[in-house]
């Protein structure tokens, strides 16, 4: 044993360490293995090797560690229960061993290594000795340099002396290798920035060249035109186009004729819609030739004809879009017989007949049935258009502005690219340069006609008059009654008015049986049955059934408020004594009729200012000088009348009277002579 310890001391001086696997395997413990890798890593190499050659034994009951097996066995006897005197007497009577007497044991013993149950402590000791021999035979020692395993520490020490101590003394210490020299990384390549200066305002797409930008804008232009065409097919637009106004007037006149003549047109329409109608044309050219040949030049504006509903269209695209409404279920308007593909489109169209204005203009208060017509109307209020061309034209749509600009710079809209230099151009460049003529002055824009009521200006008098009529003038009444000639703002108002001539009252109250000519009158009447007064005065709390009554009542409370027109929005409390305001001179009027009469005065004055100045009229002749009249009388009779511009003396007056008297006597004698003859 002393020799082994001496060899261990020599090995401790070697600069080697055992692997954690050897340290773990060199510590067999009774019942469990003790992991000493953490503790051994903190020791010196000599202490680690010395500790790896000793065994420790653990008590399976309390976990205490002991260096020898005898100490563990003597310690475990403390855990064995003691035998009482009664149990000893019972053991003597039976003649059995104490550990074998039933009832004297608290329970079987269990091996902490393999968890096997054993009846007696003696069998437990024998069983644990078997585990100890197995663990001792499995212990192997590993060389830290060559990773070779040895069953005993003696062989491991001999291997270390023979193989590694001699080679370590012969070889000089090798310095640690230097880290490899890595070449410096190349400088980063400059980033190529792709310039895309043209951004589409519709979808924010970036384009590199003007050609790509204009081609991309063309897609938005086509979609915009398609949407406008679809909107014109399914909806009645209330814009300021003269052609559409003429068509609506013709429709109103035709409907008036229907009511007056008793439906002659409907019978004619049925006859036209029968099988004798025009044949179905397969192409646009055939349809156009057929319309011109059959219906004359008057139908050239709408050459495309629908064979199912007898409607005509101005383009083939509109006819195709209309034809889709007849496929897969249709929705027909009972008022004007128009056909729609979707129920939502029909409901939107019916709002036009009912006179509903869901889209209001915040500038002038006018109402529109569709959002498309409101957007078209809002362009009239734009003071400065967004896009202005150098030729003087202005555009509110950027796409149309770009297409217009292409007319100035060729098809692509980009400046022409420079041609490659030639020999002639090189020779010409060597010659003395001639003075370049000054660039032509840009064309002057046409004179703008300002609006006298707002800061807008227009290029033509027709646009100015249209703007004043639509924005500043009174509401137009372009729909006329064919019976009495009364004008209305909407076609639905004409239809309601015609019922006053025919005596028709289609709307009946279910509560009292009264009939009314319009749905609005019926709705106001039904408030009398329900007792609901939805309009309340914010000052005194009084309620009214109609907004007009509340408006008249509010004039008693509020002072004048500066707004240009009576509000058409729901009740907000902004009313005053004189709600109608003249934007030209600032006067207020109680009624709209008074404001209209007053605005005619301004209109006449503006008409005189717009007319060219005329030549001054000729000066009137000077008035005649005042004359003095002198009457000469004798015996109550006037014998002479003297008129003079200057007063006469009395003597002169007497002489004139005597001369007149002598002349009168002579004439009297002459008359007597002629009488007697």
Curated annotation (Swiss-Prot):
Comp. bias intervals (Pro residues): 172-190, 434-449, 613-626
Low complexity: compositionally biased ranges: 410-433
State its location(s). Nucleus
Give GO terms: molecular function aspect only.
DNA binding; zinc ion binding
What would be one Gene Ontology cellular-component term for the protein? nucleus
Keywords associated with the record: DNA-binding, Metal-binding, Nucleus, Repeat, Transcription, Transcription regulation, Zinc, Zinc-finger
List the protein's name.
Answer: Zinc finger protein 526
The source organism is: Bos taurus
